[in-house]
């Protein structure tokens, strides 16, 4: 079997940490990912980063509130939940 990582990255307009964490935790779980741990950092005066350790790889959130944008990135070594995540995200 060939080693492979599937990547999805996009900029979004939501920057509120609680909404981001709740929405993407649900999206990951509903797509079939197993969230093992979440590490969060709130920056002063503003900004937020969260890293989701998944049994299938990882997901990251980086906010840029001063620009009203957030960068999200999913890396997965398992195609099925990765495809479900993209489908669920786009719907």
Segments from the language model and where they lie:
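Polybasic/polar functional segments that serve as interface/processing modules
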Residues: 1-91
């Amino acid at each position: 079997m060939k080693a492979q990582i599937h990547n999805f990255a996009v900029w979004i307009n939501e920057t509120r940490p609680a909404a981001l964490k709740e929405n993407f935790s649900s999206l990951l779980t509903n797509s079939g990912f197993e969230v093992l741990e979440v590490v969060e950092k709130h920056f002063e005066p503003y900004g937020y980063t969260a890293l989701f350790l998944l049994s299938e790889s990882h997901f990251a959130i980086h906010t840029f509130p001063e620009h009203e944008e957030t960068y999200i990135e999913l890396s997965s070594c398992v195609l099925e939940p990765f495809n479900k995540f993209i489908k669920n995200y786009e719907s």
